[in-house]
């Protein structure tokens, strides 16, 4: 009898311990979750504007006293560049764009020249080139907001760490090294480089020869303002059309430093390893450029009907470029697109032209990146033919106004480049330490989640830190095919290869004359997405059939963080808890049998 009583006392104490363990584990996890959310530090967000030339920029000042500067958002090189106000840059043939403020080193009491007299000749991956000197000075971003994990704006903030000061309205960094452009082969203002570091020994662009002071994101990481050298970019506030392209927009985007804001994109955020770039001269390999695996390209009607403009298995590296107003694709792809939208090629202009009215027909191009499809409205690929010197535009012989198609053959660059039209329609995040990029369809400004402020916060809407090797909310989309890709530029011929005669036209006295094609050519009975079977396969851009390849339209990702619960909590009834209780019951029965 005594043994039986002792057994019951042991059994009761065991169950009490079991409940206590479960309760304690659950409370600890919840407390950690709450603490993490409440102590999340704010993220610096730079407001992005657009100037009258279509360039995306952030406002800043340099020097003491501060000299106002516009820095173009440049995701394909890693350095800060300013336009010098002295020396050769005053020459009208130097290529430097003087409508933006220039930097006067001698007017700044905090400026320090690095290696005085040395000229650095730097050539960028897209063909731009600058001659410049290296200078160290203080910089300050003047249009900055502070946002935390609850997506709330912070109005009373002051963070000072090392040489960085971050508060509501500004982000100041002292002793920043940058290139002072003396001359260039393109018109430019300052540049804010955001790419990874470049490997090219013996070349001025090689990053190993410069200190960490030369890298904007590295400076922020070293000061613990951001956790890793990373950023995300949203430019979908740019709602300009070919008619309003040159109208400046003071605030049309966000450059979020060190974090991801899920309220700025829709659908899946696809994550890719950056594709290596091989320098065609030195064969040096760099892995910090935003180069992605571009798959098939579709033209999509306003009802969702689509046609493949490439081939079923098309796969080629493509460079994302925020500074390019045009995109470069394979000649054959551009010809296929031209067939579908009745565009004509004018050799004397080396441009494709199309009736501007197609901008109102709801046509788009679908760019496939693995399982992800990014849709770019065709209206974003049009530019006006208006000439300010003649105060006139081009017209077709039918009387329809003509627009330029902002697509060029990649024979001009040697690489595929997805420019402004693509960038403004995506949300992108870069982890420069892990050499990865994440891309999603950008949420437009008319979407409620972007235009309306809310105090409600859920796990799938909070801003989260990018950590080395981790981009929040992203789904990995690599494959064995994409892992083997490298970008090795081909020969730049500088001209469009043979264009079929029926797609060409002549231009004279403001009028474009040529055969052209009808917008409503419906020569195919079925128009589901598939590779084009003939050179002139076509369909109606106002067709009514649904697009069969609409995966990204319906896909979604909550992005909610996963909390690992205790395996012994009772409200969830997990398998671990059930197994343990069953073991206790079996032990109890065995004990009773022994006592009896």
From Swiss-Prot:
Glycans are attached at residues 26, 59, 106, 131, 140, 143, 148, 175, 308, 391, 455, 478, 484, 549, 552. Residues 26-575 are lumenal. Residues 1-25 form the signal peptide. Gene3D superfamilies: Acid Proteases (2.40.70.10). The chain crosses the membrane at residues 576-596. One of its GO terms (biological process) is proteolysis. It is a single-pass type I membrane protein. It is found in: Cytoplasm; Endoplasmic reticulum membrane. Keywords: Cytoplasm, Endoplasmic reticulum, Glycoprotein, Hydrolase, Membrane, Protease, Signal, Transmembrane, Transmembrane helix. The active site is at residues 74, 321. One of its GO terms (cellular component) is fungal-type cell wall. The keyword Cytoplasm applies. Its main location: cytoplasm. GO terms for molecular function: aspartic-type endopeptidase activity. Residues 56-440 form the Peptidase A1 domain. Its EC number is 3.4.23.-. Present with 149 molecules/cell in log phase SD medium. PANTHER family: BETA-SITE APP-CLEAVING ENZYME, ISOFORM A-RELATED. Belongs to the peptidase A1 family. This is Aspartic proteinase yapsin-7. It comes from Saccharomyces cerevisiae (strain ATCC 204508 / S288c) (Baker's yeast).
């Amino acid at each position: 009898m005594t043994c039986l009583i002792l057994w019951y006392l042991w059994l009761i104490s065991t169950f009490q311990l079991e409940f206590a363990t479960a309760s304690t584990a659950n409370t600890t996890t919840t407390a950690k979750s709450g603490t993490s959310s409440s102590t999340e530090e704010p993220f610096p967000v730079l407001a992005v504007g657009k100037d009258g030339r279509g360039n995306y920029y952030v406002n800043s000042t340099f020097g003491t006293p501060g000299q106002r500067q516009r820095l173009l958002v440049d995701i394909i090189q890693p350095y800060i560049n300013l336009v010098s106000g002295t020396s050769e840059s005053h020459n009208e043939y130097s290529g430097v764009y003087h409508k933006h403020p220039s930097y006067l080193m001698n007017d700044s009491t905090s400026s320090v020249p690095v290696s005085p007299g040395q000229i650095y000749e730097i050539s960028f991956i897209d063909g731009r080139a600058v001659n410049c000197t290296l200078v160290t000075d203080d910089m300050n971003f003047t249009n900055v907001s502070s946002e935390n994990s609850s997506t709330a704006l912070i109005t009373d903030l002051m963070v000072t760490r090392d040489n960085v000061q971050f508060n509501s309205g500004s982000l100041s960094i002292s002793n920043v090294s940058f290139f002072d452009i003396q001359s260039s082969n393109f018109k430019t203002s300052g540049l804010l480089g955001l790419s990874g570091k470049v490997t090219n020994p013996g070349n001025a662009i090689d990053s190993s020869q410069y200190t960490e002071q030369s890298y904007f994101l590295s400076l922020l990481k070293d000061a613990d303002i951001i956790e890793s050298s990373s950023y995300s970019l949203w430019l979908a506030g740019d709602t300009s059309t070919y008619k309003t392209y040159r109208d400046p927009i003071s605030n049309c985007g966000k450059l979020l430093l060190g974090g991801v804001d899920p309220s700025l994109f829709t659908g899946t955020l696809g994550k890719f390893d950056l594709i290596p770039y091989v320098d065609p001269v030195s064969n040096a390999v760099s892995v910090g450029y935003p180069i992605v695996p571009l798959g098939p390209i579709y033209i999509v009607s306003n009802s969702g009907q689509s046609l493949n403009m490439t081939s079923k298995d098309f796969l080629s590296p493509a460079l994302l470029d925020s500074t390019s107003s045009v995109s470069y694709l394979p000649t054959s792809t551009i010809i296929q697109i031209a067939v579908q939208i009745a565009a004509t090629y004018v050799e004397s202009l080396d441009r494709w032209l199309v009736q501007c009215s197609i901008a109102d027909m709801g046509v788009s191009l679908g760019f496939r990146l693995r399982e992800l499809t990014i849709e770019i409205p065709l209206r974003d690929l049009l530019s006006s033919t208006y000439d300010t010197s003649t105060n006139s535009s081009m017209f077709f012989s039918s009387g329809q106004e003509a627009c330029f198609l902002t697509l060029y053959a990649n024979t001009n660059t040697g690489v595929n480049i997805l420019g402004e039209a693509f960038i403004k329609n995506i949300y992108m995040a870069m982890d420069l330490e892990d050499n990865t990029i994440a891309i999603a369809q950008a949420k437009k400004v008319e979407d409620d989640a972007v235009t309306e402020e809310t105090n409600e916060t859920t796990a799938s809407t909070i801003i989260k830190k990018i950590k080395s090797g981790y981009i929040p909310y992203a789904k990995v989309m690599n494959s064995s095919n994409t892992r083997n890709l490298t970008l090795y530029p081909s020969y730049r011929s500088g001209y469009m290869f043979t264009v079929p005669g029926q797609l060409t036209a002549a231009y004279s006295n403001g009028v474009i004359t040529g055969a052209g094609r009808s917008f409503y050519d419906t020569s195919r009975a079925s128009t589901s997405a598939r590779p084009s079977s003939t050179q002139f396969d076509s369909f109606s851009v106002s067709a009514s059939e649904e697009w069969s390849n609409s995966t990204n339209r319906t896909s979604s990702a909550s992005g909610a963080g996963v909390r690992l619960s205790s395996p012994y909590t009772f409200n969830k009834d997990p398998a671990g808890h059930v197994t343990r209780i069953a073991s206790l019951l079996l032990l109890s029965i065995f004990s009773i049998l022994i006592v009896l």
